[in-house]
Amino acid sequence: MSMLCYTLIIAFLIGIWAAPKSEDNVPLGSPTTSDLSDTSCAQTHEGLKTSRNTDQRHLAPKKAEDQELGSAANIIVDPKLFQKRRFQSPRVLFSTQPPPLSRDEQSVEFLDNEDTLNRNIRTKRETHPVHNLGEHSVCDSISVWVTNKTKATDIKDNMVTVMVDINLNNEVYKQYFFETKCRNPNPVPSGCRGTDSRHWNSYCTTTQTFVKALTMEGNRASWRFIRIDTACVCVISRKTDNF
């Protein structure tokens, strides 16, 4: 009987000795579960860093390319900026297509540097009753849609940058200016047409007025009053040799 008890005790001890060791009994230098987790996290972090660096290397040329283009069409404008716009002028137009002809249907030229828009749009001057009576303009003027105005003088006599293209609601709009200027400072040899050259000196000159346009202020778009050509007038002065 005692022999059977000794046999059972020895078998029990052998079973305990052969059982798997717990994590607390792992020798120093053996990789525990926490060490494996840390190693796995570190490898994952390194993989993410490598992936990010690779993505940045692929994106860097594209960003540099965008900076080299420097297109004003990349400037995104908040639509709320147009809700705050006041003192609107019919001579300033934002459109995705070439602007319409002048309302009085006078000779209008549409000018642009791009090949797709490099064309002239002209309409014949509508016959007006006053022209049949022999009436003529004192000065000859020409009206032009300006599509590439980049610089202008503001109301404080400062040179400002005018936005040509803007990105509004994922659409590219151009800013057009309808300008009028003199065709010739001396339509007739004596100066302005119809003046008495015996008593008056005269010449035609282009005058300007202020319109509210979208300009760049630092890195932001803002409204400013700028000067544009709007009329052709006759300037006269009395000849002093008659006194």
UniProtKB/Swiss-Prot annotation:
A GO term, aspect molecular function: growth factor activity
Signal peptide boundaries: 1-18
Coiled coil region boundaries: none
InterPro entries for the chain: Cystine-knot_cytokine, Nerve_growth_factor-like, Nerve_growth_factor-rel, Nerve_growth_factor_bsu, Nerve_growth_factor_CS, Venom_nerve_growth_factor
Statement: the UniProt record of this protein carries the keyword Secreted: yes
Cellular component GO terms, alphabetical: axon; dendrite; extracellular space; synaptic vesicle
Origin: domain of life: Eukaryota
Cysteines engaged in disulfide bonds, as pairs: C139-C204, C182-C232, C192-C234
Subcellular location: Secreted
Expression sites by tissue: Expressed by the venom gland.
Name assigned to this protein: Venom nerve growth factor
Organism: Cryptophis nigrescens
